[in-house]
């Protein structure tokens, strides 16, 4: 077994990472194929309509973005040749680079970019702030467009370059004109891979082939930026819901890659010289519990605060991960050891206080109505391994609890429902947020508090939205820190989201996959497969 890691414990810092990207500069042999088991099966083809990471990963296979972030955190052009900023800091002019082609042969144009940004910005929480600040978006010519804002801001660069959900993927204009409420079904991008629709079996199999017409950038690959050079002919994603089946398959050479290896089975992989383990904190993240603010009983703030008081992060993380070197408790909404990491307002977040939970429920007049928790049994890190612990902690805190078991895709669909429980609604769901998605009040979509326009759960706090917009229009470090701290205090008081700790992902790959890219997303460009 070969292990690649920049640290031995999470205490070294969850901000430093060696992500699970795959890369190499060697040439691929004919008809090479990587067979991969991703964190969850691919069922949807719309990376704008949901924050589910497997669909984000799919997006990076076939689409491209205007901007990217390199391994040092710097914003770099990707589809762009350049951008320019007006003297007053309000207008950004973007120019596309040469050689951008859709998979069906057409040229990528500024009209495609404008339509794609518009659809994405209605869904993405940072995009929503950007849209509120935008006064004009103008097509200048087929390769050039501009965005003008009501005040000086760098939110366009930040929003269009952010690597994780929702990434601002550029689509053909005809596709991007689809209502955000209607999932797209086409799979035509301009990225380094093409999607083979004829092979697609939702939840079972997805096939990508090298896009021979793709023109990569000339700069070396770095993080999500630089050249996206495909060195294999095909990548196939397959579903293996049983963890032991996946481990046996990679040991036997039947598959090449597991995005998230099961922690309890790592000893079986560590002892195999044909397997490399890749420890990633940037692709790991923060498990969260999300409460439905629209439906009883969590439409009552006291009941939400009771739920927070009942939670014990240590018990939950132990159930989820097990090995303490891969997790830690953390009371920071924006991540521990990050620029805006703080425990301000966290109160009872880390340790349970069942007596306080019961007292709050009594004060709220809670009548014992069952709280319905959705349990994604096929996705450990999103709750499959720890929802039973949450249920027990809530019961100890005085709640009546009903656990509804389901697969991850069913949860992703059901969590969009704002209906009462009797009509298929819900009270609690769990998932995890990548550290790339939680670093500040703009990136952290769970902090958004614009009611029914917010992420699933729909908290509403006008002051939080005011602070988030202020965060987008200042560059004073002290002011930014003060804004982030106040956002955390307000969100935690309102129980907009309940962070449950932090963990590192451990991925597994055959030793024949050479080269590792530092990236917050598992990528398949720049990879060399040298054998079985």
State where each predicted segment sits.
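Gly/Pro-rich hinge or "lid" segments in bacterial periplasmic/extracellular proteins
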Residues: 164-236, 244-245, 355, 359
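Ligand/substrate-recognition segments at binding pockets and active sites
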Residues: 202-204, 243, 261, 327, ...
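Extracytoplasmic/peripheral linker and loop segments enriched in polar/acidic and small residues
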Residues: 348-350, 402-413, 417, 442-511, ...
């Amino acid at each position: 077994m070969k292990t690649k890691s920049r640290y031995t414990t999470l205490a070294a810092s969850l901000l430093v990472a060696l992500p699970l990207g795959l890369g190499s500069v060697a040439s691929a042999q004919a008809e090479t194929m990587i067979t991969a088991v991703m964190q969850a099966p691919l069922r949807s083809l719309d990376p704008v309509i949901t924050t589910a990471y497997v669909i984000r990963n799919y997006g990076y296979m076939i689409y491209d973005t205007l901007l990217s972030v390199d391994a040092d955190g710097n914003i770099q052009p990707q589809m762009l040749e350049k951008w320019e900023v007006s003297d007053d800091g309000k207008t950004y002019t973007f120019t596309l680079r040469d050689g951008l082609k859709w998979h069906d042969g057409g040229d990528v144009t500024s009209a495609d970019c404008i339509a794609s940004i518009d659809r994405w910005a209605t869904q993405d929480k940072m995009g929503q702030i950007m849209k509120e600040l935008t006064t004009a978006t103008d097509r200048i010519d087929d390769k050039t467009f501009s965005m003008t804002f009501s005040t000086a801001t760098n939110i366009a660069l930040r929003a269009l370059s952010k690597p994780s959900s929702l990434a601002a993927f550029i689509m053909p204009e005809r596709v991007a004109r689809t209502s955000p409420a209607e999932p797209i079904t086409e799979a035509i991008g301009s990225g380094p891979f093409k999607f083979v629709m004829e092979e697609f079996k939702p939840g079972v199999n997805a096939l990508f082939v090298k896009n021979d017409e793709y023109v990569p950038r000339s700069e070396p690959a770095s993080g999500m930026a630089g050249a996206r050079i495909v060195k294999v002919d095909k990548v196939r994603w397959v579903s293996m819901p049983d963890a032991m089946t996946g481990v046996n398959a990679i040991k036997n050479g039947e598959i090449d890659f597991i995005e998230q290896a099961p922690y309890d089975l790592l000893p079986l992989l560590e002892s195999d010289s044909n397997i490399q383990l890749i420890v990633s904190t940037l692709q790991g993240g923060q498990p969260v519990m999300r409460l439905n603010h629209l439906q009883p009983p969590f439409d009552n703030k006291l009941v939400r605060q009771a739920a927070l008081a009942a939670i014990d992060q240590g018990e939950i993380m132990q159930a989820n991960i097990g090995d303490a070197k891969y997790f830690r408790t953390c009371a920071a909404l924006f991540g521990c050891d990050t620029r805006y990491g703080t425990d301000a307002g966290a109160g009872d977040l880390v340790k349970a206080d069942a007596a306080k939970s019961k007292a709050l429920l009594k004060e709220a007049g809670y009548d014992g109505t069952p709280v319905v928790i959705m349990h994604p049994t096929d996705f450990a890190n999103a709750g499959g391994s720890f929802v039973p612990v949450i249920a027990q902690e809530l019961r100890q805190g005085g709640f009546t609890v009903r656990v509804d078991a389901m697969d991850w895709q069913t949860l992703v669909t059901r969590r969009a429902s704002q209906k009462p429980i009797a009509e298929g609604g819900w009270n609690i769901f769990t998932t995890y947020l990548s550290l790339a998605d939680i670093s500040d009040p703009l990136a952290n979509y769970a902090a958004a508090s614009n009611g029914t326009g917010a992420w699933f759960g729909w908290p509403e706090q006008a002051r939080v939205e005011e602070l988030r917009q202020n965060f987008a229009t200042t560059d004073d470090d002290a002011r930014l820190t003060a804004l982030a701290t106040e956002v955390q205090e307000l969100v935690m008081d309102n129980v907009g989201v309940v962070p449950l700790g932090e963990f590192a992902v451990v991925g597994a790959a055959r030793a024949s996959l050479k080269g590792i890219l530092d990236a917050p997303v598992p990528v398949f460009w720049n990879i060399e497969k040298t054998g079985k």
